[in-house]
C-alpha cells in the first residue's frame, strides 16, 4: 500500500476520531456548497487539512441536483456569469479549497465531460462578485420550506411501515430543488 486513506459517511464526531487514529494520506468526503454541515462537512475538511490529510471530494454536484437548479436559485448565478453551467459553479466551489486534491464527478454523457474539462482548463477561482452570487443562490435554496427532520430515526420503526426519515428527506429535497424526477426515483 502506497497511500492509505478512507471514505467517510458518518457525522463529524466520528470523522475526527478516525482522522486522529493514525497518519492518513487522504480521506474521501461528501462535500458541496449545500452540504457544508453534512457528515464531515467544512469542519471536517478544515480539520483534515490541519492534520495534513488530503481530501478527495465525492458528490460535488450533489448527485446532479446542483446542475439543475430551479430558476429562483440559478438566476443570481446566471446573472453573474452567463455561459457557465450550474455544474461548473458547484465544481469551482469545491476546487476553491486548497486541501481538495481530487474531485470526483459522476458524468453520464460527453457534454458533461466537456463542461467539467472546460471548468478546470484552466481553473479560475471565484471573483468577489461571483461569491456574492453564489451566496445569494445558497440563501435562496436554504430559505425553502423544510420539515426539520434530522434523520435520527427515533421515529422508527413506524407501525405502518413508512420509512419516515426517507419520506421527509425526499419532501425536503423536492421543496428545495423542485426536481420531480429525482423525487419520483427515490
What do the predicted segments below correspond to?
Residues 1-5, 54:
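Short beta-strand/loop segments at the ligand-binding rim of alpha/beta enzyme cores
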Residues 5-10, 28-35:
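Catalytic beta/alpha-barrel core
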Residues 10-23, 41:
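Distinct, well-ordered alpha-helical segments
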Residues 14, 37, 113:
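Glycine/Thr-rich phosphate-binding loops of Rossmann-like dinucleotide-binding domains
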Residues 33-37, 62-65:
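Short gly/pro/ser/thr-enriched loop/turn and capping motifs at secondary-structure boundaries
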